[in-house]
């Protein structure tokens, strides 16, 4: 296998870990989750009339008859098949056989983008709400309203707007993109340089933050894999999330394998020096079984997270890895010692 394919394999997604509700059930149990939902709903969902109305709405709404990976549609959402979307997707073959997917905006969608820019420049939230009534699946409007809801402290509404944006982009994508999300070779790739694609990056990144606020670390990590796999040059700096979330979610073995695969990929086109070195740093790297050449040198979090992951797996090289992290980032070690009152 090539370093590229090995890294892509490490980034393959598990659909069951994409839904935060599954992680909450594993943490607290299904009964506790249902009780919390009934409490938030004031007992209304338990009434037969409410259930029947909701079921009728679900039967009439085509959104509920579609299998999705990125979110679970709600019967209260506008029927996407009866609404204007204005997005499609193209695929381009890259050298080496890799396939890159890109969203495309129609002329009418671009006009909606112009109206969105006017609404944002007015600094009036009601202008965005009015625009959403006309274009209920306009992605940038949904993302902006999600940000407004988050600033107001309504995380539930913020998450609902994010889910709607992701649903619109998933439904407008080609079937190969949707099926490739859970492929064993990793999610499809997208071009971050295309402005039409950046709304997807923004929606996924905000989802990571939202899931982290809820304490669903495993779900957040899975979405980090998706965002990093879209473009492994990491334009959103998602590695700064992975070091924290991998430790919090106890995915220690995966994290160590990912770091090795990432460094092998980034150095696959570089020629290693054949002359042996006898510096103190090289001796520490040898003792820590550290074969990386650059991934850990720039990132404080990755260096210390690797040492912590080795300690969590009871590896004998964990102490040497911690010493190496301190040598690489001495200022961070001083701050940590101050926090620990050492």
Question: Which role does the model predict for each range below?
Answer:
Residues 1-126, 134:
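Extreme N-terminal leader/anchor segments
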Residues 130, 169-196, 227, 265-296:
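Flexible helix-coil transition and linker loops at the boundaries of alpha-helical arrays
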Residues 73, 78-96, 272-294, 299-342:
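Long, ordered, amphipathic alpha-helical scaffolds
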Residues 144, 201-202, 206, 240-244, ...:
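"A position-specific structural signal for the A-helix of alpha-solenoid helical repeats
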Residues 90-121, 126-130, 151-214, 248, ...:
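Short coil/linker segments at helix-helix boundaries
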């Amino acid at each position: 296998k090539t370093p590229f394919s090995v890294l892509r394999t490490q980034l393959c997604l598990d659909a069951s870990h994409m839904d935060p509700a599954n992680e909450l059930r594993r943490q607290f149990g299904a009964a506790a989750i249902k009780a919390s939902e009934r409490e938030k709903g004031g007992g209304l969902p338990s009434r037969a009339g409410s259930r029947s109305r909701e079921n009728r709405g679900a039967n009439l709404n085509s959104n509920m008859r579609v299998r999705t990976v990125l979110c679970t549609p709600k019967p209260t959402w506008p029927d996407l098949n009866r609404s204007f979307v204005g997005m499609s997707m193209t695929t381009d073959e890259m050298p080496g056989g890799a396939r890159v997917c890109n969203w495309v905006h129609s002329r009418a969608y671009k006009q909606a983008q112009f109206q969105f820019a006017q609404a944002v420049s007015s600094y009036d939230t009601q202008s965005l709400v009015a625009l959403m009534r006309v274009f209920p699946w306009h992605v940038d409007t949904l993302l902006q309203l999600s940000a407004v809801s988050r600033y107001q402290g309504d995380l539930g509404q913020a998450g609902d707007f994010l889910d709607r944006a992701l649903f619109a982009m998933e439904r407008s994508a080609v079937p190969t993109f949707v099926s490739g999300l859970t492929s064993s070779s990793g999610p499809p790739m997208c071009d971050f340089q295309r402005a039409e694609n950046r709304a997807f990056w923004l929606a996924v990144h905000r989802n990571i933050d939202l899931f982290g606020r809820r304490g669903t670390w495993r779900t957040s990590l899975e979405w980090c894999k998706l965002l990093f796999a879209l473009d492994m040059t990491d334009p959103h700096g998602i590695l700064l999330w992975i070091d924290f979330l991998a430790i919090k979610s106890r995915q220690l073995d995966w994290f160590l394998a990912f770091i090795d695969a990432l460094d092998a990929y980034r150095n696959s086109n570089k020629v290693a020096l054949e002359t042996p070195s006898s510096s103190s740093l090289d001796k520490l790297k040898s003792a820590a079984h550290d074969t990386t050449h650059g991934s850990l040198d720039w990132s404080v979090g990755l260096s210390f997270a690797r040492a912590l992951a080795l300690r969590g797996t009871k590896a004998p090289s964990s102490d040497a890895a911690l010493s190496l992290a301190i040598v690489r980032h001495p200022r961070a070690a001083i701050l940590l010692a101050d926090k620990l009152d050492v």
